[in-house]
Amino acid sequence: VAAIQTVLG
């Protein structure tokens, strides 16, 4: 996924 990496930082 990609949206998850955004919240991870």
Swiss-Prot record:
It is an enzyme of class 3 (hydrolase). GO terms for cellular component: extracellular region. Optimum pH is 4.0. Its EC number is 3.2.1.4. Optimum temperature is 30 degrees Celsius. Induction: Induced by Co(2+), Ba(2+), Mn(2+), Mg(2+) and Cu(2+) ions. Repressed by Hg(2+) ions and methanol. It is found in: Secreted. It comes from the Eukaryota. It catalyses: Endohydrolysis of (1->4)-beta-D-glucosidic linkages in cellulose, lichenin and cereal beta-D-glucans. The keyword Hydrolase applies. Disulfide bonds: none annotated. Its main location: secreted. One of its GO terms (biological process) is cellulose catabolic process. One of its GO terms (molecular function) is cellulase activity. The keyword Secreted applies. Keywords: Carbohydrate metabolism, Cellulose degradation, Glycosidase, Hydrolase, Polysaccharide degradation, Secreted. Has endoglucanase activity on substrates containing beta-1,4 glycosidic bonds, like in carboxymethylcellulose (CMC). This is Endo-beta-1,4-glucanase. It comes from Aspergillus versicolor.
